[in-house]
């Protein structure tokens, strides 16, 4: 989890924000998934947020559900996902790698075993999307035992108690929700969340990255101007994959261009 701290220190010294793309591992196939990750890094991604496909994704909108179905159709299994993660870590030793997933996948092998496996392949953080802070003890304790950062979602309506808990338990970064609901680029990010960001800073929370509905450079710029340490974009990236399934070269080029544009918005003016 030290990779996040090193990244944020490096970016702060340059007065930059972080741009973090999300993709589902195995979409559209394990082999193409690794090429897609290369394109994201070449485009300038500061860190990666990766999903392990799951049959019942509660927080995902239609775009990411389609990605999950494509990954399943290509035969992607959790074991293969861990092989991909090990390959990505080997290729990019300093890049923070986060997982975004659901509790059933953590439970399937035992919570401690899951985090041990994450640590073994070089995963820096895990966000379990369907586990609220008040039920997170077994997850965050296992994560900390294995030096994996437990990531918590800060919703737009978080009260003071929740903000204090997130600040106390979270490591790596804080996933700041632009709005309630499911993911999707078609649901644009709401206005910057200055109040929450100020409170998280006051309580010494891990740096906030704003996610949900980030699909254009202006939104990245607005998030950083509001005090976020950066932005996460998922559905807009997965949409590019979906729209170019029949043309691999165009897909990789479009992904690179998109990341380059959103990363550029994180640079000082």
Curated annotation (Swiss-Prot):
Annotated catalysed reactions: (1S,2R)-1-C-(indol-3-yl)glycerol 3-phosphate + L-serine = D-glyceraldehyde 3-phosphate + L-tryptophan + H2O
Biological or metabolic pathway of the protein: Amino-acid biosynthesis; L-tryptophan biosynthesis; L-tryptophan from chorismate: step 5/5
One Pfam family here: Trp_syntA
Gene Ontology cellular-component annotations: cytosol
Active site: 49, 60
Gene3D superfamilies: Aldolase class I
EC number from the UniProt entry: 4.2.1.20
PROSITE patterns: TRP_SYNTHASE_ALPHA
Family the UniProt entry places it in: Belongs to the TrpA family.
HAMAP family: Trp_synth_alpha (MF_00131)
NCBIfam families (UniProt xref): trpA
Name listed for the protein in its UniProt record: Tryptophan synthase alpha chain
Organism: Cronobacter sakazakii (strain ATCC BAA-894) (Enterobacter sakazakii)
